[in-house]
Amino acid sequence: MFYLCTTLYFKQFTFMSTELFSTLPYKVADITLADFGRKEIDLAEKEMPGLMALREKYGESKPLKGARIMGSLHMTIQTAVLIETLVALGAEVRWCSCNIYSTQDHAAAAIAASGVAVFAWKGETLADYWWCTLQALNFEGGKGPTVIVDDGGDATMMIHVGYEAENNAAVLDKEVHAEDEIELNAILKKVLAEDKERWHRVAAEVRGVSEETTTGVHRLYQMQEEGKLLFPAFNVNDSVTKSKFDNLYGCRESLADGIKRATDVMIAGKVVVVCGYGDVGKGCSHSMRSYGARVLVTEVDPICALQAAMEGFEVVTMEDACKEGNIFVTTTGNIDIIRIDHMEQMKDQAIVCNIGHFDNEIQVDALKHYPGIKRVNIKPQVDRYYFPDGHSIILLADGRLVNLGCATGHPSFVMSNSFTNQTLAQIELFNKKYDINVYRLPKHLDEEVARLHLEKIGVKLTKLTPEQAAYIGVSVDGPYKADHYRY
């Protein structure tokens, strides 16, 4: 009865006015999807043994009691399990998505109905997106978070840019061309007009941030090098049980899921161009080859290029590949990987997509403003662009994450690895005082995350004898590898 009453109570608030600092308990697409979301969350919990083990281990001691956790991370079913783990460990949580297309509306509804403040829906505008981020950063009484779960670094960036603007408002008037930066500056101007010290107060209370993805980690290291980082950070992305699993095995399954749901195209026999051969690129390349595609790889790093070649992939430049490919996938985390001059030369109905965090790997803006271009929307997140010469390309998810924009992202099991790391990082940051720097979780915790997932898939681990451990200079219980070991 309580659950039904809660659902009815919440429903009346959906899609009300969007004042700068809202008093809404949540904002989602459709709260009536909560029951559907709850059923899928129940299924996902069985596939996420790491998170469930942390609930069992820390449920009574509640190491996050008193923590105000703000999350900016794809609002999916798997993320719902993470959120409810943080709550079970004692935290007060507010959440938004880190991508305008990645929210699963039934997951957001289920979390909202459970009493967590979530501001996310699939198909947000960029203005909506930054408004949602602001709401997630705004706890009761105008307080900010004590710890942050970030994916891509946008929550961290909002605080840092806002902080800088309070010192020098002119930073918000600098010329920017990316629409997301334009909208960020616009909302920060409104915040500054209302409260000229907000971000200084918020930053002072943040004990740290744990960052999920490569792009966000790059931002953190850059701020640290420039002396601008305002609080400690954990680089979760480079934990072995994240980068070598989520990035590799997750993409190996979710890329094909996104492409097929969007286009129903036959991959076998196609030429697929994978831009980048890091962990994400490796997963994507092997995925496409497993479907029977001929895979071409582009790379700037000679080591990664050699790895690709030794795996049997043809390593070429985009200048050559753009004329040959049927499907293009960017995986680099860099800008301008597929330029408009490449798209001009592509085959008719070439499929172009991205599985890196931001849409700037593909020159989407240049495509939209190309003289004489004609856009035809096929269905949500699938657009066909006709060039004046008659050929067309199909852009998926508007150049944003194809696996989350056109499908539901990585499977639950592999996300349990990543989110177990996130939870451990949150416990560390909240309970210990770190100097301002960028850190990684220690090796023994990385191994523990892996260990928590072995039983689920039937793994039986061999145990070292004391003599064997002494011979190679490790403890019987680990860690088993040096920090520099590359796996």
UniProtKB/Swiss-Prot annotation:
Binds 1 NAD(+) per subunit. Keywords: Cytoplasm, Hydrolase, NAD, One-carbon metabolism. One of its GO terms (cellular component) is cytosol. NAD(+) binds at residues 213-215, 247, 276-281, 299, 334, 355-357, 403. It holds the Pfam family AdoHcyase_NAD. One of its GO terms (biological process) is L-homocysteine biosynthetic process. InterPro entries: Adenosylhomocyst_ase-like_sf (IPR042172), Adenosylhomocysteinase-like (IPR000043), Ado_hCys_hydrolase_NAD-bd (IPR015878), NAD(P)-bd_dom_sf (IPR036291), S-Ado-L-homoCys_hydrolase_CS (IPR020082). Pathway: Amino-acid biosynthesis; L-homocysteine biosynthesis; L-homocysteine from S-adenosyl-L-homocysteine: step 1/1. SUPFAM superfamilies: Formate/glycerate dehydrogenase catalytic domain-like, NAD(P)-binding Rossmann-fold domains. Its EC number is 3.13.2.1. Substrate binds at residues 76, 151, 212, 242, 246. SMART domains: AdoHcyase, AdoHcyase_NAD. It catalyses: S-adenosyl-L-homocysteine + H2O = L-homocysteine + adenosine. Its cofactor is NAD(+). One of its GO terms (molecular function) is adenosylhomocysteinase activity. It is found in: Cytoplasm. Its main location: cytoplasm. Belongs to the adenosylhomocysteinase family. May play a key role in the regulation of the intracellular concentration of adenosylhomocysteine. This is Adenosylhomocysteinase. It comes from Bacteroides fragilis (strain YCH46). The gene is ahcY.
